[in-house]
Amino acid sequence: MKKLRCDQTPAWAALNTHFNASGRHFDVREAFARDARRFEAFSQDAPHVFADLSKNLIDADSQALLLALARQCGLEQQRDAMFAGELINSTEQRAVMHFLLRNPPSAQYTPAQAAINKIADAQAEVEVTLNAMLAYAEQVRADAAITDIVNIGIGGSDLGPQMAVLALNEFATAGKRLHFVSNIDGDELAGVLGLVKPENTLFLVASKTFTTTETMTNARSAKAWFEARGGQDIARHFAALTTNVAAANEFGITTTFGFWDWVGGRYSLWSAIGLPLAIAIGAAGFREFLAGAHAMDEHFRTAALEDNLPVRLGLLDVWYRNFHGFSSRSIAPYSSALRRWPAYLQQLEMESNGKRVDKDGQPLPFDTSPVLWGEPGTNGQHAYFQMLHQGTAVVPVEFVAVKRAAHGLPGHHDKLLANVLAQAQALMRGKKDAGGHQDFPGNRPSTFLLLEQLTPASLGALIALQEHRVFVSGAIWGINSFDQWGVELGKVLARDIEPRLQSGDISGLDGSTAGLLQRLR
């Protein structure tokens, strides 16, 4: 029997009825007044992360109905299929096993897991590659002649490593500067090359296929710069993170670290793509990073849906997107170290769930991924928080805060924490003003994620939490969260347009593109 689409389930119909009866007019301030234990009921400890969901527009009834929706959509079975190594990336006929990259060597497997895709064999390959990569990272860390490491990659080969290196700067070794080049705009590469010397620089070329246009254009330019300035020994100063060893060798690179087709780009930070982070924080730190993520994997895999933080967050996303109609979510990390967190989440969620068809290729009659956007606090308060508090659109906000700061500057952290608490409170409480201009409607929802400290383990857990949350909403919507065909069309058209910039040929182009091309020549 064909599986019901989520909007055809009894739970979806019940959620619609509940929303129209009470959810549409739910007031979180009244909910707190009625229930002295609301904070306890809608907050949760998970590995390395505490979450307060109590300021959201949910009650026990909506949560129960969302959990019923999850069960009627087969969420548990879909989760188990991923962890069993089944080919859940249906459009590319691939397993989705990035969780293997953070499994400890002692991990045990069920007979079902061992039978599908030979998970135990894959785990052994992962450990061999991880050990080799971490040994190389320690070699680079010990090499005093290498002062600068330039990572050349884009998408998952850039956003994850860059975000994590910045976040864990407090744990980074002294004497090594990490740089990231992703954009094909030459200004970015030129800016980095102006800071480094050939004899002191290691270039990491991160491209699964070793054919990515942006990455290979930048890599070739970096190689030409290196040779033009008397750089010697390409093999020592370039390493590749790729599965295309032959192409890397042809480029002149002999040091390569690969990964597998069951690792999607936006989930590749845990693989060889994480080499920049391993160089920054060392092998022990990188293993702690993996361990934090594994702890969250186990929580997601084993916890009951009612007590499963990724599930609760993913269902909240469905509630807001499909019933309240909220089209975006603002990401507000109150940590300068997490300044690239919003950009990282943009790819993770919007590339995963920004789909308009289900797994069978059929158009969906409901909305999927929201738009994610944000800036670190307190900067965002002086930019767009005006709209969050007094604008016409309701935008759920997700705060991230760190209890203990790494720096020792007196007074700073208390002020930072006071601000994040105040913003969440102000969004909920609001303020009445007869004149209108200083009226804050309140009842604006927010989620608060709290880390005890920003460490390799807590960052790993925080990332894995978001990965699984995205899986949950994608599973409810019935989409394939692990392909990204939407990035392909523009690439194809760019290859056609590039030679036209030299030739001026506008045949077959639409009027707008033709007009712009002529002005650009």
Swiss-Prot record:
EC main group: isomerase
Main location: cytoplasm
Compartmental location: Cytoplasm
Catalyzed reactions: alpha-D-glucose 6-phosphate = beta-D-fructose 6-phosphate
Pathway: Carbohydrate biosynthesis; gluconeogenesis; Carbohydrate degradation; glycolysis; D-glyceraldehyde 3-phosphate and glycerone phosphate from D-glucose: step 2/4
GO molecular function: carbohydrate derivative binding; glucose-6-phosphate isomerase activity; monosaccharide binding
Keyword Lipid metabolism (UniProt): no
CDD domains: SIS_PGI_1, SIS_PGI_2
EC code: 5.3.1.9
Gene Ontology biological-process entries: gluconeogenesis; glucose 6-phosphate metabolic process; glycolytic process
Keywords linked to the UniProt accession: Cytoplasm, Gluconeogenesis, Glycolysis, Isomerase
Function in brief: Catalyzes the reversible isomerization of glucose-6-phosphate to fructose-6-phosphate.
Family statement drawn from the similarity comment of this UniProt entry: Belongs to the GPI family.
PANTHER family referenced in this protein's UniProt entry, alphabetically: GLUCOSE-6-PHOSPHATE ISOMERASE (PTHR11469:SF1)
UniProt protein name: Glucose-6-phosphate isomerase
Native organism taxonomy: Bacteria, Pseudomonadati, Pseudomonadota, Betaproteobacteria, Burkholderiales
Underlying gene: pgi
